[in-house]
Curated annotation (Swiss-Prot):
Naturally occurring in which organism (per UniProt): Homo sapiens
Segments forming a coiled coil: none
Pfam assignment, any one: Avl9
Record keywords: Cytoplasm, Endosome, Guanine-nucleotide releasing factor, Methylation, Phosphoprotein
Domain of life of the source: Eukaryota
Domain dDENN positions: 395-528
Limits of the cDENN domain: 273-393
Key word Metal-binding present: no
The UniProt record lists the keyword Cytoplasm: yes
Descriptive protein name: Protein DENND6A
Length: 608
């Protein structure tokens, strides 16, 4: 692996574009539209935030863009990183190099798109871009950024070229981002990658300059994102959207002849196409993902492996999959030894692999999905069977789900009949995906609602919140107490599926997904208690209070109130703006009631 880069491609450089690139910027192009459940009163934003420095807008969407080529002497090499000031460690560059190319056995001729995910190096500062951090709180939990990971979105081209020593042109254009917007970034690559391979670095620089003019990725706003003559109209979902709804952004009447290509999502994959070979076992796979079981997808190419892994992770939405997952994983990955060791039980992770070597290396894993080539939309492959793990010897083994897992729930025959009928009637894959996604959503909601109801009961009563005492603690989660609630308020109220729901819950309570979910809910509820405590303080007559207390106690109160304000701002507590303003007014009034020497000191201490 090596790093090479043209000196002229620095962050401040403005290289002249050739005529072809200039033409690309000026020509009329289709407008791409993506949506995610937009309410009618959505604001639109096609301007860039004020006061931003060069590359700040770019950094809100992308960490960097890489070009990875093949060098006969060096192997896969990062040829360009843009903007040039972007920081990647040597370990990260090595991972990007190997993950940006299909394994040689994949035989991917032509253009191939896929996605990978890799761990950020431990030696670098782990932080989110300030803009991302600001908007993260409004995202659904499954779209929140994980500061420890990057996503890589790849457009790989391999074509015969007799002028090259190797006989093939092999190159990948890779977008590196914190954002898990799979469908959106794949669409961006479809627009820019083919022309980049013809026009090279000047075209890439122009595309990056366009991205740097984009507005910030604000959830809930309709955003206009121009790139190389194409305008994308997108809406990022918010945590307030109703789960499972995808209302297309309404197009305004346009006087020009732009063609609109509508993308109904920024992050979802074609879930039916991915589950198609195994949809008879989709409910069992849902259980395995829900429970955070070690799962490996063996596929013929990175496209199939990455799409299938992402579909699996997505099938428990709106619940977030809290364990690690790798849409495309290679033997060169820096976590290869960690994830393939036999000295301990396989970790809670979903891996997508294509190298035959993994059939032997991972044969001790308890659950393996072996899939063949995914069929084009509208076709359905032969359904694979559940097979014993001992029958899996090589990656050439027949497609199937290799596991000895016994599902807790009885199989829902209704959804299978519905999907099979759709296949017979040649129902479009998009419609099949809507049916399957709704089925998974209802299944997940039936499972999670009893947990949500019980956890809500752990919240102290509002009347127990005193402004002069610390906020009360949440009651402890007691598994047996929760189990007793299932008799009257269990999933049988909302789901037709029978089976051992109690056993499924007991297993789930020991899983990483429960741990992550409960920590998230506990944090939200603790923040709600802090917000209610602030509101209780605001309702008090603090000037009357200080008349009955000493100067020392009053100064202590001011400092505590200032800390409360800082905490509310830092942790994005769900506090109403007028509550914050009221508290600032209280603080100012208390300070003015103190002697002048103390006023000067307190006004300098922190911000009011």
């Amino acid at each position: 692996m090596a790093l090479r880069g043209p000196a002229g491609l620095g962050p401040g450089s403005r290289r002249p574009l050739d005529e072809a690139v200039a033409g690309a910027e000026g020509r009329e192009a289709p407008a791409l539209v993506a949506a995610g459940g937009a309410p009618e009163d959505d604001e639109e934003d096609d301007g860039r935030g004020r006061g931003l420095l060069r590359w700040d807008s770019f950094s809100a969407w992308l960490h960097c863009v890489c070009v990875v080529g093949f060098d006969l002497e060096l192997g896969q090499a990062v040829e360009v990183i843009y903007p040039q000031h972007s920081k990647l460690t040597d370990r990260e560059k090595t991972n990007i190099c190997y993950l940006s190319f299909p394994d040689s056995n994949s035989g991917c001729l032509g253009d191939t798109q896929f996605c990978f995910r890799f761990r950020q190096s431990s030696g670098r500062r782990v932080s989110l871009h300030c803009l991302l951090d600001q908007f993260d709180k409004d995202l659904p939990v499954y779209l929140k950024k994980d500061p420890a990971y990057f996503y890589g979105y790849v457009y790989f081209r391999q074509v015969r070229d007799k002028t090259l020593k190797r006989g093939y042109f092999q190159k990948s254009l890779v977008l590196i981002s914190k954002l898990p917007y799979i469908h959106f970034f794949h669409t961006v690559l479809k627009q820019i990658a083919p022309e980049y391979f013809e026009k090279n670095e000047p075209y890439l620089e122009a595309a990056c300059n366009d991205v740097d003019r984009w507005p910030a990725p604000v959830p809930g706003k309709t955003l206009h994102l121009p790139i190389m003559g194409v305008v994308m109209k997108v809406r990022i979902p918010t945590c307030h959207d109703k789960p499972g709804t995808t209302q297309i952004v309404q197009l305004t009447q346009q006087v020009d002849t732009n063609i609109s290509v509508i993308l109904p999502t920024v992050h979802e994959v074609d879930i039916f196409r991915c589950f198609c070979p195994v949809f008879l076992h989709s409910q069992m796979l849902w259980e395995l993902v829900l429970l955070g079981e070690p799962l490996v997808v063996m596929a013929p190419s990175p496209s199939e492996s990455s799409e299938t892994v992402l579909a699996l992770v997505n099938c428990i939405s709106p619940l977030k999959y809290f364990s690690d997952f790798r849409p495309y994983f290679t033997i060169h990955d820096s976590e290869f030894k960690e994830y393939t060791t036999r000295t301990q039980a396989p970790p809670s992770v979903i891996l997508g692999v294509t190298n035959p070597f993994f059939a032997k290396t991972l044969q001790h894993w308890p659950h393996i999905i072996r899939i063949g080539d995914l069929k084009p939309t509208g076709e359905i492959p032969k359904q694979v069977k559940v097979k014993k793990l001992k029958n899996l010897k090589t990656l050439d083994s027949k497609p199937g789900v290799y596991t000895s897992y016994k599902p807790y729930l009885n199989r829902d025959e209704e959804i299978i009949k519905q999907l099979q009928k759709g296949v017979q009637q040649k129902r479009p894959s998009e419609a099949q995906s809507v049916i399957l996604r709704r089925y998974f959503l209802e299944l997940t909601q039936s499972f999670i609602i009893p947990l949500e109801r019980y956890v809500a009961s752990l919240m102290p009563l509002q009347k127990s919140i005193s402004p002069w005492k610390s906020p009360p603690q949440l009651r402890q989660f007691l598994p047996e107490e929760f189990m007793k609630t299932l008799e009257k308020t269990g999933p049988q109220l909302t789901s037709r599926i029978k089976g051992d729901w109690i056993g499924l819950y007991r297993h789930f309570l020991k899983s990483p997904n429960f741990d992550g979910w409960f920590k998230t809910r506990r944090k939200e509820m603790t923040q709600k208690l802090e917000a209610l405590h602030l509101e209780a303080l605001c309702e008090e007559d603090l000037l009357l209070w200080i008349q009955k207390h000493t100067e020392v106690e009053t100064v202590d109160l001011v400092l505590k109130l200032k800390n409360k304000l800082l905490q509310a701002d830092r942790e994005h507590l769900p506090v109403k703006p007028d509550t914050m303003e009221k508290l600032r007014t209280h603080i100012d009034a208390i300070i003015l009631a103190l002697p002048e020497d103390l006023q000067g000191i307190l006004l300098k201490t922190g911000m009011t």
